[in-house]
């Protein structure tokens, strides 16, 4: 347990020191920074804010986790594959950010390129992590999926990777939402006695808390796709490594809601010839523009943050209650 806590503290301190250095480098190199393409007026002031800050906490968490797991003889297959997903999905995000920031290609990687790399990572993860005989845990039941488990695994990894990416739309929202989700999985890992996975979880929590110091409103840096895609993949990988896949639907309700809002909006728009359900999606922008109803007073970013964090916290507590109190 001491090693796991140490991982979190060390990663927190590295990120706390690393982010200011990253921002300073960004400014000195006169890199353009974040481009704003959203129809939210208050976001236009964010244009030029350094992005790709996720690179700092990602490298810190991966290196610290690897070294401490190696030192404490906890470098298991599961740890290795969770770190692999962090690195590969982080690389996909890095390439996406690089094309946007340095090559001025607004869409970054095209969807097919991004999906191909994410699927490749998913296949490798499936082949090498310690899976439970292709069994899918649903509450207290075990469903044998056989060869179809790989389809589920790919859907889970790619889906939640992109879902967290959609959530990263206002200052601090994604970073603390993921801290809450990881904290719930930290409890599950501890109860299961999987201290190896707990080490990686606490390392990333430390990195995200260090990052949040500079990412809360008004954000001095954004995590970019390099951070958000890696974090989403990590959550999916951890849920599978702990054999509690179903829990991510509740623990990750914020990401599910964000993604569902986009799917509903696009479908309804096409079916009705231009009508919308929400003012704007992902749905956090709907609240920014007009509160819960979309027609009321606009919510500040802090208010949206606390609302979503509250939902995520309640969902995480509900999941733990279902697992251990019912």
Swiss-Prot record:
Belongs to the glycosyltransferase 4 family. MraY subfamily. GO terms for biological process: cell division; cell wall organization; peptidoglycan biosynthetic process; regulation of cell shape. It is found in: Cell membrane. Keywords: Cell cycle, Cell division, Cell membrane, Cell shape, Cell wall biogenesis/degradation, Magnesium, Membrane, Metal-binding, Peptidoglycan synthesis, Transferase, Transmembrane, Transmembrane helix. GO terms for cellular component: plasma membrane. It is a multi-pass membrane protein. Its main location: membrane. Pathway: Cell wall biogenesis; peptidoglycan biosynthesis. The chain crosses the membrane at residues 3-23, 51-71, 79-99, 115-135, 138-158, 169-189, 195-215, 221-243, 306-326. GO terms for molecular function: metal ion binding; phospho-N-acetylmuramoyl-pentapeptide-transferase activity. It comes from the Bacteria. The gene is mraY. InterPro entries: Glycosyl_transferase_4, PNAcMuramoyl-5peptid_Trfase, PNAcMuramoyl-5peptid_Trfase_CS. The keyword Nucleus does not apply. It catalyses: UDP-N-acetyl-alpha-D-muramoyl-L-alanyl-gamma-D-glutamyl-L-lysyl-D-alanyl-D-alanine + di-trans,octa-cis-undecaprenyl phosphate = Mur2Ac(oyl-L-Ala-gamma-D-Glu-L-Lys-D-Ala-D-Ala)-di-trans,octa-cis-undecaprenyl diphosphate + UMP. Pfam families: Glycos_transf_4, MraY_sig1. This is Phospho-N-acetylmuramoyl-pentapeptide-transferase. Its cofactor is Mg(2+). Its EC number is 2.7.8.13. Catalyzes the initial step of the lipid cycle reactions in the biosynthesis of the cell wall peptidoglycan: transfers peptidoglycan precursor phospho-MurNAc-pentapeptide from UDP-MurNAc-pentapeptide onto the lipid carrier undecaprenyl phosphate, yielding undecaprenyl-pyrophosphoryl-MurNAc-pentapeptide, known as lipid I. It comes from Streptococcus pneumoniae (strain CGSP14).
């Amino acid at each position: 347990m001491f090693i796991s806590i140490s991982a979190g503290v060390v990663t927190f301190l590295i990120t706390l020191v690393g982010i200011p250095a990253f921002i300073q480098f960004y400014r000195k190199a006169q890199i353009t920074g974040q481009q704003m393409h959203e129809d939210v007026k208050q976001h236009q002031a964010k244009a030029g804010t350094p992005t790709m800050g996720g690179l700092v906490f990602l490298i810190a968490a991966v290196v610290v986790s690897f070294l401490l797991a190696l030192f404490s003889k906890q470098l298991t297959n599961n740890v290795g594959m969770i770190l692999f997903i962090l690195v590969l999905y982080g690389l996909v995000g890095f390439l996406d950010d690089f094309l946007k920031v340095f090559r001025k290609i607004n869409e970054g990687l095209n969807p097919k390129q991004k999906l191909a790399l994410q699927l490749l990572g998913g296949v490798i993860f499936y082949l090498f992590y310690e899976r439970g005989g292709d069994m899918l845990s649903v509450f207290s039941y075990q469903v044998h999926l056989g060869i179809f488990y790989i389809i589920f695994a790919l859907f889970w990894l790619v889906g939640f990777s992109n879902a967290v990416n959609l959530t990263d739309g206002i200052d601090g929202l994604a970073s603390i939402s993921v801290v809450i989700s990881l904290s719930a999985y930290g409890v599950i890992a501890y109860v299961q006695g999987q201290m190896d996975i707990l080490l990686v979880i606490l390392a990333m929590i430390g990195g995200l808390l260090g990052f949040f110091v500079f990412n809360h409103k008004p954000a001095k840096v954004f995590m970019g796709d390099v951070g958000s895609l890696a974090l989403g993949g990590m959550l999916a990988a951890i849920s599978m490594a702990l054999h509690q896949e179903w829990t991510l639907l509740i623990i990750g309700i914020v990401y599910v809601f964000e993604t569902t809002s986009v799917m509903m909006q696009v479908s309804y728009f096409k079916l009705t010839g231009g009508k919308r359900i929400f003012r704007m999606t992902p749905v956090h922008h709907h609240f920014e523009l007009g509160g819960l109803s979309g027609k009321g007073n606009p919510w500040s970013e802090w208010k949206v943050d606390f609302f979503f964090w509250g939902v995520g916290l309640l969902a995480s507590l509900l999941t733990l209650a279902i697992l251990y109190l019912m």
